[in-house]
Each structure stands twice: as structure tokens, then as C-alpha cells.
Amino acid sequence: MLIGLNSGGLAIVAQSAAIGTPNRWLNPVAVVDLDGDGRAEVAAVITPHLGGPLKVYRREGDALVELAALPGFSNHVFGSTELALSMPMVIDGTPRLLVPDARREQLRIIAFEHGRLVEVGRCALASPIVGAIQPVSQREVTVGLRGGPKLMAPGDCLK
């Protein structure tokens, strides 16, 4: 569901098909132009506690249309209020998505290329991600690990 301003108030401006079973949810990753066409895509992990897929949508009128999906992600810790366990980052001039794997033990670097989500890198971690991923500079982020925050440069993890 995409919320926007409509006649001076907030309103639903677009939505996707239902994600399935009741009481399931998704955790947004980013709204960003992933393919360089000047239009923003919406990325989210569906059912993050179940190691769900990362999906990318684009707004087409009042619909969010699914463009691509890739399985095996989790960007939320059950019971936590922290929702920022993933983020977009420009690496080598190209937008990428930083999203933990299903066990939150590796940080996957994902590109949207030719209409597909593709893993272009993976960073091994000393302990599971339990806190926010935050930008420090154009090249570095801090990752909230169970053992404490870690400074890293995701570009160093590209394949």
C-alpha cells in the first residue's frame, strides 16, 4: 500500500495484491530508482520472520505491480521495534539494496538488472544483524550486530 497526499489529506494512492494469509506483513526496504529509468521502485521483504522474498514493485496508476522477487531474506527481528535492518546504497555509481539473508548472518547486496533481482555480493558477519543498518559515508555503513555495531564497506563484498 502506498500512501500519499490527496485533496490535502493522506490517502491510499496505490496498492499491490494481498500478500496472502491474514496476519502476515511486509517490511519496506526502500523507495528508490533501482534501474536508472527515472521512476522509483518500491522494495520490501514479505513475511520477514519467515525468511520471505524480497520483492520490487512499481506504481502503475492506482496499482503497485510486482516486477521481480528473490527468496531468502529477513529484515526484522521478532519482537523488536527496529525496522531499519536494510537500506539502499549507491555502490560504484549504481543503486543497490543491502538486505540480510533469512538468518540475518550475511548481508546480501542486491541489484535490479534487466527486470530481475540479482545478488551481486554478500558480506559475512561475525554475529546476526539485530539492529539498524545506517550510512556513515558514501562508502561505509554501520551494521547493528548482536555483538555490537560493525563498520563496513559493502562495496568490498561484491562478487
Please give the residue ranges for each predicted region:
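Beta-propeller-forming repeat regions
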Residues: 1-159
